[in-house]
Swiss-Prot record:
Gene Ontology BP, a term: chaperone-mediated protein folding
Protein name as it appears in the record: Trigger factor
Organism: Azospirillum brasilense
Entries under Gene3D superfamilies matching the protein: 3.10.50.40, Trigger factor ribosome-binding domain, Trigger factor, C-terminal domain
Entry keyword set: Cell cycle, Cell division, Chaperone, Cytoplasm, Isomerase, Rotamase
PANTHER family: TRIGGER FACTOR CHAPERONE AND PEPTIDYL-PROLYL CIS/TRANS ISOMERASE, TRIGGER FACTOR-LIKE PROTEIN TIG, CHLOROPLASTIC
MF-aspect GO terms: peptidyl-prolyl cis-trans isomerase activity; protein folding chaperone; ribosome binding
Length: 444
């Protein structure tokens, strides 16, 4: 085998590889011998089929397999002999092959860059520190109390307001006909809840208990009863009673409704999700700050092919968002401006990914099988009843498994860097933390 470097441009390399006819023939004969031992043909005992017969019947497929093996083996040998760390699979282009002759092909590769991470201990980061504010817990408790409200008569002399419950007999049309499915007495209708035909409840706002109202409405064109679709209808309605929702008191009794020993325990339970969101936001802010500083401090060349792949993924998602009307400000930008912007983002992501990978490699940071198993279980739980299929999918799909492993590895490397860096704390309010203008942006 003869290997010659024909081109070197940045991280790109191209090699010409020539495999001798003798080497090809050895692979062909080896494959024919394997078939001779296993193939079964009429008129021959197992393992006794002459090689000439095997070649006559299977020669074409055997040669194709031999050439494929020769290219795979020689390309692997070429990379190993030169100690090349490639970013992506080589691009192979067969230049020339005639039966019985040498095999000549070119191999194009992109190399991983040599990366020298900066001094991690010199990184200075600021970590926002926030606690759950009492007002947020109070608001949540108020919502819980409202959800456990009870109805009580309106005792004061006043007209019906939105949110009140007007007790009426089933609405009767001016013709004396009751509505289908609404026959009955003492029907509680919450005003403003849009339980009935649009406009009906609004015309009862302002009525008092004992008052009679004539209500005019137009039924929607898609109303389920054919006779009423799009019909202009007049109803005669008697408001028999007004009731109001009275929220439960925020006390130990309310806590016990939720299985808590006391109001203090309920406050802790209500505050827990808020604290979880604060932790997530703090982690996001610190990680974004860290990645920004790493990006500023490192400017090595990145493999163009990796940038192309990353950009294509970003661009496909953007096209879907543009079609769905969820692209926000991007919807009004020219295509070339968007491509320039997102190619820059793709290059940044690739550079940061390579940098984090190198830091992890140098410090022997590994993703354990237990961590992968936990991630698999979490993913499977997203598909109740299909857990077995999820596990089988990841078992058969190495790329999907790598996509599951990659964020775990990244988080472990980020945690390692944070342990090395100088991290100061800055107290902020929970409201300020949550108002981060880039809160929905991805960390990378």
């Amino acid at each position: 085998m003869n290997i010659t470097e024909t081109s070197a441009d940045g991280l790109k390399r191209e090699y010409k590889v020539v495999i001798s006819a003798q080497d090809i023939e050895q692979k062909v004969q080896g494959r024919l011998e394997e078939l001779r031992r296993t193939v079964q043909l009429p008129g021959f005992r197992p393992g006794k089929v002459p090689v000439a017969v095997i070649k006559q019947r299977y020669g074409g497929s055997v040669l194709a397999e031999a050439l494929e093996d020769a290219i795979a083996d020689s390309s692997r040998q070429a990379l190993n002999e030169r100690g090349l760390r490639i970013a992506m699979q080589p691009k192979i282009n067969v230049e020339k092959y005639e039966d019985g002759g040498d095999l000549s092909y070119t191999m194009g590769v992109e190399l991983l860059p040599d990366i020298e991470p900066g001094d991690l201990s010199g990184l200075e980061l600021e970590k926002p520190v926030a606690t759950v504010e009492d007002s947020a817990v109070d608001e949540a408790l108020t919502r819980l109390a409202s959800a456990h409200s009870v109805q009580a008569p309106v005792t004061e002399d006043r007209a019906a307001e939105k949110g009140d419950i007007a007790v009426i007999d089933s609405p009767v049309r001016s013709t004396g006909e009751a509505l289908p499915g609404m026959d009955g007495k003492d029907y509680p209708l919450e005003l403003g809840a849009n339980q009935f035909v649009p406009g009906f409840e609004d015309q009862l706002v302002g009525a008092k208990a004992g008052e009679h109202r004539t209500v005019k409405v137009t039924f929607p064109a898609d109303y389920p009863h054919d006779r009423l679709k799009g019909a202009d209808t007049v109803f005669e309605v008697d408001v028999k009673e007004l009731r109001k929702n009275v929220p439960a008191e925020v006390n130990d009794d309310l806590a016990k409704e939720f299985g808590m020993e006391s109001l203090e325990k309920l406050r802790e339970a209500v505050g827990r999700p808020h604290q979880g969101r604060i932790r997530q936001r703090v982690a996001l802010r610190v990680k974004r700050q860290l990645l920004d500083k790493l990006a500023e401090a490192h400017s090595f060349e990145v493999p163009p092919g990796m940038v192309d792949v990353e950009f294509e993924g970003i661009w496909q998602r953007l096209q879907q968002e543009l079609q769905n009307g969820t692209a926000g400000e991007d919807a009004g930008k020219p295509e070339e401006e968007l491509k320039t912007e997102y190619r820059g983002i793709a290059e940044r992501r690739v550079r940061l990914g390579l940098l984090l990978s190198e830091i992890g490699r140098r410090n022997d940071i590994q993703v354990t099988q237990d961590e992968i198993n936990r991630a698999l279980i979490a993913e499977a739980r997203r598909f109740p009843g299909q857990e077995r299929q999820v596990f089988e999918f990841f078992k058969q799909n190495r790329e999907a498994l790598e996509n599951l492993r990659a964020p775990i590895f990244e988080d472990k490397v980020v945690d390692y860097i944070l342990d090395q860096a100088k991290v100061s704390e800055k107290p902020v309010s929970a409201e300020e933390l949550m108002k981060d203008p880039d809160e929905e942006a991805e960390a990378a």
